């Protein structure tokens, strides 16, 4: 499998995990002037000669058997079209044109072909997920050989499938060209994330949402990273619903803007309680907290107990800041004051001692 961080060494498994596009049929890229109008004047005439020009005699001998029309056959539109297709589908020609020469006995049929350029190497542009070294090894173009458009097309599909398999659903080969030196240039667009834009958040600040994204701006869109990012935003506990929309990029139509739509709910709580016992008398409890303080994502809580015969005033105040740097380091503190009454009993169940335990202090958490 391809490693996105180390560059990987094997793109040949791109058809794994359902990526069947790596093995679909690839059409050869060539042009032809053949049409029914140009062939009709020769339909029915006897083919007295059959040749392929633009290649060596040895190559012609290898190619002639793939032609369906033979010497002695009558010219037909379908037959000429089929032979143009057969030659074009070899992948070695950029142009295939039938040429008729009238002779007393009938016509001589020649297929004039233009051979693709000889490649000297391959160059990749726009790739950041896979290294050029890995892609070059996968393409496996041997210098000095004629470019085969079918072979190249299959390799291009393999590259596209590898991107899709690894979650880069917007990445694909965008263009191919051969320069005057015979170098095959492969241009790849990877679907860069131009921006991450929160929407629907009336209280929560934008940065509280975007800092949870493991999918980063300026990096190729990856559906697995976006999925994890949405889960992290939802797990903040501030929202009833979190959805993602993909919008076209402003700088480049191949890029994408991620809009994350949220539906907020209340994050503050207030608890009031009261109780009575003979030992303690009437006690009251007040507790209030906020899990998204002023939309910053900070959390605070105040717990206060009042009343009782001893007029206890137990309280605890805590505050947590989940992000103090870009790495998600948290810092929290709590301050508490507590007094509890304890009673000891003997084996007969009689009270033998009564004492109070007081505690006061603070805690600091970091990490």
What are these regions (language model features)?
Residues 43, 79-80, 99-107, 151-152, ...:
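Short, glycine-/polar-rich solvent-exposed loops and beta-turns at beta-strand/coil boundaries
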Residues 104-138, 181-192, 259-266:
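Signal peptide-directed extracytoplasmic domains
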Residues 131-133, 158-160, 172, 203-206, ...:
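Gram-negative/organellar outer-membrane beta-barrel architecture
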Residues 2-108, 112-119, 123, 361:
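N-terminal, post-cleavage mature segments of outer-membrane
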Residues 64-74, 147, 214-223, 304-308:
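Short, polar/charged loop or turn motifs at beta-strand boundaries
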Residues 60, 64-67, 77-85, 132, ...:
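Extracytoplasmic/secreted envelope proteins and their assembly/folding machinery
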Residues 18-53, 118-123, 142, 160, ...:
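Acidic, glycine-rich low-complexity/disordered segments
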């Amino acid at each position: 499998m391809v490693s996105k961080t180390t560059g990987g060494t094997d793109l040949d498994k791109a058809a794994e995990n359902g990526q069947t596009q790596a093995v679909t049929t690839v059409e050869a890229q060539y042009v032809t002037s053949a049409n029914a109008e140009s062939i009709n004047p020769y339909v029915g005439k006897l083919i007295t000669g059959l040749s392929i020009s633009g290649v060596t005699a040895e190559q012609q001998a290898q190619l002639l058997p793939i032609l369906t029309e033979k010497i002695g056959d009558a010219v037909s539109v379908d037959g000429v079209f089929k032979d143009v297709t057969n030659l074009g589908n070899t992948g070695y020609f950029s142009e295939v044109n039938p040429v008729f020469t009238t002779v007393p006995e009938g016509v001589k049929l020649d297929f004039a072909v233009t051979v693709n350029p000889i490649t000297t190497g391959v160059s990749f542009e726009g790739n950041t997920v896979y290294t050029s070294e890995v892609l070059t090894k996968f393409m496996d173009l041997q210098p000095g050989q004629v470019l085969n458009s079918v072979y190249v097309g299959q390799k291009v599909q393999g590259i596209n499938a590898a991107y899709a398999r690894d979650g880069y659903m917007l990445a694909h080969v965008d263009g191919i060209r051969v320069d005057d030196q015979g170098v095959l240039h492969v241009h790849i667009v990877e679907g860069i994330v131009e921006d991450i834009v929160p929407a629907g958040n009336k209280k929560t600040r934008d940065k509280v949402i975007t800092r949870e994204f493991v999918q980063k701006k300026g990096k190729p869109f990856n559906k697995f990273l976006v999925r994890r990012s949405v889960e992290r935003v939802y797990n903040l506990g501030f929202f009833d619903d979190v959805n993602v929309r993909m919008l076209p990029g402003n700088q480049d139509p191949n890029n994408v803007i991620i809009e994350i739509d949220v539906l907020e709910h209340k994050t503050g709580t207030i608890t009031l309680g009261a109780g009575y016992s003979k030992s303690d008398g009437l006690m009251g409890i007040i507790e209030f907290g906020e899990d998204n303080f002023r939309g910053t994502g900070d959390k605070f809580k105040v717990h206060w107990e009042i009343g009782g015969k001893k007029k206890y005033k137990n309280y605890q105040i805590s505050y947590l800041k989940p992000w103090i740097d870009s790495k998600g380091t948290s810092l929290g503190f709590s301050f508490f004051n507590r007094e509890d009454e304890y009673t000891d009993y003997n084996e007969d169940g009689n009270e033998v001692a009564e004492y109070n335990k007081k505690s006061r202090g603070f805690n600091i958490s970091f990490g």
